């Protein structure tokens, strides 16, 4: 299995208590090599203000969000391994984990898995796409040793 090259950038006011780089690497490696040989992904961990600004600029949503995915579009005729960027908001991930009663580490893992699938072209706009994407997320999360992230919705 090929390994994903990770460029981890921490842009939070306080970076203490964040997952280790090795954890981010493990989570990426559980997803991307199944679909693509050589890949490079940037993960940028930000605070609420940056997430809010990016979400408003790129999605027209006036609030912070847990994860944004920015796939890299390779120009025709060029071969590059850059898959794209994930921007994850620390405070939103922490708040969601608490509200949903999920272990924080598991929710971080889920955000990386979810965002990575977006980089690979998966989406959840249509119901059938959402079902396919959620099934993949669940399969990957279980393989990583975490619970089904959608278990509460299925009960």
Swiss-Prot record:
Signal peptide as annotated in the record: none
Pfam families in the record: YbeY
Binding annotation for Zn(2+): 114, 118, 124
Cofactor note: Binds 1 zinc ion.
Coiled coil: none
GO molecular function: metalloendopeptidase activity; RNA endonuclease activity; zinc ion binding
InterPro entries found in the cross-reference section: MetalPrtase_cat_dom_sf_prd, YbeY, YbeY_CS
Protein name: Endoribonuclease YbeY
Protein localization: Cytoplasm
Cofactor(s) demanded: Zn(2+)
CC per GO annotation: cytoplasm
Entry keyword set: Cytoplasm, Endonuclease, Hydrolase, Metal-binding, Nuclease, Ribosome biogenesis, rRNA processing, Zinc
The protein's role, per its UniProt record: Single strand-specific metallo-endoribonuclease involved in late-stage 70S ribosome quality control and in maturation of the 3' terminus of the 16S rRNA.
GO biological process: rRNA processing
Transmembrane spans: none
EC number: 3.1.-.-
Family to which the UniProt record says this protein belongs: Belongs to the endoribonuclease YbeY family.
Organism of derivation: Shigella dysenteriae serotype 1 (strain Sd197)
UniProt cross-references to HAMAP family, sorted A to Z: Endoribonucl_YbeY
Keyword Chaperone: no
Predominant location category: cytoplasm
UniProt keyword annotation of rRNA processing present: yes
Domain of life: Bacteria
């Amino acid at each position: 299995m090929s390994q994903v090259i990770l460029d981890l950038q921490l842009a939070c006011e306080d970076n203490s208590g964040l997952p280790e780089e090795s954890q981010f690497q493990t989570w990426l490696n559980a997803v991307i090599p199944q679909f693509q040989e050589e890949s490079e992904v940037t993960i940028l961990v930000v605070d609420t203000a940056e997430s809010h600004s990016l979400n408003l600029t790129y999605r027209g949503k006036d609030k912070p969000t847990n994860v944004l995915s920015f796939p890299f579009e390779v120009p025709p005729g060029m071969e590059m391994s850059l898959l794209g960027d994930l921007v994850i908001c620390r405070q939103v991930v922490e708040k969601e984990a608490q509200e949903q009663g999920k272990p924080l580490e598991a929710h971080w893992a889920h955000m990386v898995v979810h965002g990575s699938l977006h980089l690979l072209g998966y989406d959840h706009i249509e119901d059938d796409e959402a079902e396919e994407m959620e099934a993949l997320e669940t399969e990957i999360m279980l393989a990583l040793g975490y619970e089904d992230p959608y278990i509460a919705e299925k009960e």
